[in-house]
């Protein structure tokens, strides 16, 4: 049973003892992609890098879909698919195996409509724009935005913490203002 007991060496502390039952391990049996038209499922499987037979780990799955530097969502957002989303659904659980359906919405590619620079009082605007890897008329790219922020920070005129892009998507028009 779980317990909390006073620490024998330091009376201002307590020791917490917990019994944890992790449950059974589950394994990925199959991954089926739904809604993908831009990339073939073989390529998406390589990017996801979770294979049949791997131990199911929800945290790792979410990282591979959305958080890692080479995550699936980055693949799409770097090609203009700002409105992209993917929802992993457990469609079949049998014994210790899980079948997944990756339900994707690719959406249309977003074009940068405008880039507004606000709060700058130190540098001429054309100097700031010269450092940007994103320009109006280009496809949206998350990597290019991050690279632009790094370049602006390296100029030495701005606090990196204050360089925060305000991304305003317009799904109806397929554009984005930054």
Predicted regions and their residues:
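Periplasmic polypeptide-binding modules associated with outer-membrane biogenesis and secretion
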Residues: 1-178
């Amino acid at each position: 049973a779980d317990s909390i007991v006073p620490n024998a060496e330091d009376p201002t502390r307590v020791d917490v003892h917990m019994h944890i039952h992790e449950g059974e391990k589950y394994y990925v049996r199959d991954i089926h992609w739904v809604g993908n038209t831009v990339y073939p499922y073989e390529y998406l499987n390589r990017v996801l890098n979770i294979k049949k037979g791997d131990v199911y780990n929800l945290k790792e799955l979410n990282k591979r879909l959305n958080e890692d530097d080479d995550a699936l969502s980055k693949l799409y957002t770097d090609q203009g698919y700002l409105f992209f989303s993917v929802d992993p659904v457990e469609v079949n659980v049998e014994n210790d195996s899980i079948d997944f359906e990756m339900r994707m919405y690719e959406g249309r590619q977003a074009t940068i409509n405008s880039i507004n620079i606000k709060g700058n009082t130190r540098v001429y605007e054309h100097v700031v724009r010269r450092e940007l890897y994103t320009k109006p008329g280009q496809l949206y790219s998350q990597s290019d935005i991050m690279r632009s922020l790094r370049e602006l920070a390296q100029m030495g005129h701005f606090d990196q913490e204050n360089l925060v892009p305000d991304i305003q998507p317009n799904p109806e028009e397929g554009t984005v203002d930054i």
